[in-house]
């Protein structure tokens, strides 16, 4: 089984440009779709997860369901699959920062802003739940 891709590598038709984030289960990259010359976010799961047949089947099924979601608060999925025995999801790249970085940079946010942002996240989770998906890593 191959290791995770490195910046500059070609992976499943995508050229890895930068690492956007790392977690216990995956690495998210900024990548270029080589067929369309478009920028995407590429999430590649840890190699040890791809070797677990139960996890692999669940991942592929949940990815198909997630790709069917059409909601303004849900990032669209463009592609998913397996490459060099690693599981991946290609999705819309959204530039900017996450909530943790925003608070770190700006300090506390106003309660009205927090409610607005939490409301958007809740609507996205509700759309997923209606399709039978449960997000396992809400922070």
Model regions: which residues?
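Conserved ATP-binding/catalytic core of the eukaryotic-like protein kinase fold
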Residues: 1-139
């Amino acid at each position: 089984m191959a290791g995770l891709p490195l910046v500059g590598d070609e992976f499943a038709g995508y050229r890895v440009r930068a690492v956007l984030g790392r977690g216990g289960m995956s690495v998210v990259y900024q990548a270029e779709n080589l067929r369309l010359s478009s920028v995407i976010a590429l999430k590649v799961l840890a190699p040890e997860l791809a070797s677990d047949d139960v996890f692999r089947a669940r991942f592929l099924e949940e990815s198909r369901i997630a790709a069917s979601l059409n909601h303004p608060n849900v990032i669209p999925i463009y592609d998913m699959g397996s490459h060099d025995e690693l599981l991946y999801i290609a999705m819309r790249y959204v530039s900017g920062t996450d909530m943790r970085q925003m608070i770190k940079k700006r300090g506390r946010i106003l309660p009205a802003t927090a409610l607005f942002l939490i409301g958007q996240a809740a609507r996205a989770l509700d759309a997923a739940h209606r399709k039978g998906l449960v997000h396992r890593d809400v922070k």
